[in-house]
């Protein structure tokens, strides 16, 4: 078949910090591999070395060589690798330069000088291959996360890239979009494309990949075949689960005393015109998952509960006005960058009136150490990594005295270890006040949630998690939510 990627890294470092060392492997034409490992293991750096972002965008010192299609990456001119490698980032918005779908898909072809007639033909072909013809004429900002990822992949097909590199492409996707991604990747592999994916979520890849490259602390720790990926290997290497059907509830039962009531709350939004009313109660010790497809009203409901949106209809028991709801709820938002207002992590967590409160300061220190943020405490929050920002946003909500906690996708893009750290903090908080958890992360749900609120076009309902694991998994997987 022939080698299309040859990696021989003796050492790669940023300044004096070694990031990768003794990483050597090859990728055959038409092969699909996943690069896995805990955050900080070197996955993103390796991806940047492969697609040429290092050294063209990011500086660093490489001892060794990386070859793409038999040619050292250092021999390619700036931008030339884009002819052969298609890139799909974790957040597709980071790679978009156009406002409309067709213009974005055509961009690589325009930049590489394709004739207009050929370019138009390839744009149409790419959209047909990915079943996104219906998106013609749409604005990118109007699309869902899954649709945006398909547009990003379509742009790689316009120049007929031999190699497609994806960096955590499902971190922000719901189950329906992940299944779409799985079908797209399987189709591309069937066309002979070489696929390299850096990913934490593995359940959708097991029947696609040929090998799993496992990095640990910058070293190539192991290479696994799909048949090697059993539960023992998963636990030993702290990998995300391979099969959701094997998950069972681990959460303790909620208490009996009702602390929060939500009555006849309207969650109608621009996407869904149906005005199905939300109604539920929350007891002490309860962590309730809120699940449903994107656009169904989960975030609208959360914003109403926390006072960011006015309640159009209905009432809640813990507050009357928008201002009171803001005061009595603690929240961690999906776009947590908007939650930071101070110049250091410490100042985000320690209000002026708490600076002399030794008990509070000890609690902050305990949480910072537990969430692996202690050595980041003097940094600007905006300089943290994505996962570190998520954990800081979670910690802000955990420390606030409140009557209700609302968490929106607190583990998106987190590895198994950090997901487990986050879950233990959520469990601890749920013992104090009820927690509402909006999530597409089934592993987290089964670890911490004792109830689930299922939202769909056919109505909303609340169920216990224990004993209903199969029903919840079916609900996640179903496009037509029951």
Regions found by a protein language model. Give the residues of each.
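H-loop/switch region of ABC-family ATPase nucleotide-binding domains
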Residues: 199-200, 439-440
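ABC ATPase C-loop
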Residues: 157, 397-398
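Conserved ABC transporter NBD signature motif
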Residues: 59-72, 313-327
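Conserved ABC ATPase signature
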Residues: 139-143, 147, 380-384, 388
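Catalytic Walker B motif of ABC-type/P-loop ATPase nucleotide-binding domains
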Residues: 164-167, 405-408
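Conserved ABC ATPase "signature" region
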Residues: 117-135, 359-376
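Conserved beta-strand-loop-alpha-helix hinge in the C-terminal portion
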Residues: 219-241, 459-481
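Hydrophobic anchor residue at the start of the ABC signature
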Residues: 153-154, 394
